[in-house]
Amino acid sequence: MKYQVIIIGGGPAGYTAAEAAAKGGLSVLLIEKNSLGGVCLNEGCIPTKTLLYSAKTYDSAKHASKYAVNIPEVSFDLPKIIARKSKVVRKLVLGVKAKLTANNVTIVSGEAQIIDKNTVRCGEETYEGENLILCTGSETFIPPIPGVDAVNYWTHRDALDSKELPASLAIVGGGVIGMEFASFFNSLGVQVTVVEMMDEILGGMDKELSALLRAEYTKRGIKFLLSTRVVGLSQTEEGAVVSYENAEGNGSVIAEKLLMSVGRRPVTKGFGLENLNLEQTERGAIRVNEKMQTSVPDVYVCGDLTGFSLLAHTAVREAEVAVHSILGKEDAMSYRAIPGVVYTNPEIAGVGETEESASTKGINYQVIKLPMAYSCLLYTSDAADDLIGV
């Protein structure tokens, strides 16, 4: 069977590329080994935001009297929260499939194996393609900390499906994923400790905003250990023991559950990538140019596999550029103004350069900061202590 475009991976990059290519008049084959939607739809952006919305609603209900709304007794039902999350995910996955089917994209479920740039096998079938787009995404990175294999730790997948709340939770990693889970579990009454190797949470975000968010969650009971390196892990009857060292010396945290949230890395194994001999970056991602072209003609890479920006909206834009390249349309990828949002409560967001990045790059800049109290609308919702900076 022959196609003009073969796409491996059905996440935001893959399904966007498939739809765009099909609308451009190309015959398209999309191969996905798990559920359509990728990490974002199944175990990332969407399920976490669904849980966070429930937590935010619960938090608002607890403080409703502040707005002259009396709710005698406020409670939550964790199994129902998890069930609602799963329902939302299922509905959106079906929506992706329906859209692809409506655009005559051929969808094959299974593990793809690349034979060469024009040949891909899946199960007993072999497919030929004129163009190959790789959208295999990323996977959770678990650092080789001594004792990690002996600890019953959570990844984000486990945290998304847990129907029982631990009394305490230690989170290794204070990035976006770590902080969103810290927000969720803290809102539901779990004692949370965040251990972060950097000197501030949410690396890459504006440091002042990150510090403000940390201060707010410190008030709410979350404990932060910054500039702290985890040196060992162990399991006891009481829970996981996180041994660490920092400028103050050595110490440990004991928690009923441990969430490993150090980061993600591109998926480069298990689908025959080595048969293409693509040029890779120092960190193992696939090197591409501004048209999403790799070092091999007619082979494109989009999404987390590029290693640039592990965000769904970045992947969508990369997919558009890749398809435009195949169709001969003038387009180029730019990473200058990619928005980033942390869906904690309160949320923080940013786009473009931060003061730190502008200073590092030698860019002359001016900063304008404005308290949210200047906005009458935001003042009505008690957001007066928040901040906007340009």
Segments and roles (model prediction):
Residues 1-10, 167-172:
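Beta1/beta-strand and adjacent pyrophosphate-binding region of the FAD-binding site
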Residues 2-3, 19-26, 31-165, 193, ...:
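Glycine-rich flavin
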Residues 5-29, 181-186:
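N-terminal Rossmann-like FAD-binding beta1-loop-alpha1 element of flavoenzymes
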Residues 8, 128-137, 255-263:
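Short hydrophobic core segments
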Residues 149-165, 252-327:
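FAD-site-proximal beta/loop scaffold in flavoenzymes
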Residues 349-381:
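Structured beta-strand/loop patches that form or line metal/cofactor-binding pockets in enzymes
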Residues 379-390:
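Single conserved hydrophobic/aromatic residue that forms the stacking wall/gate
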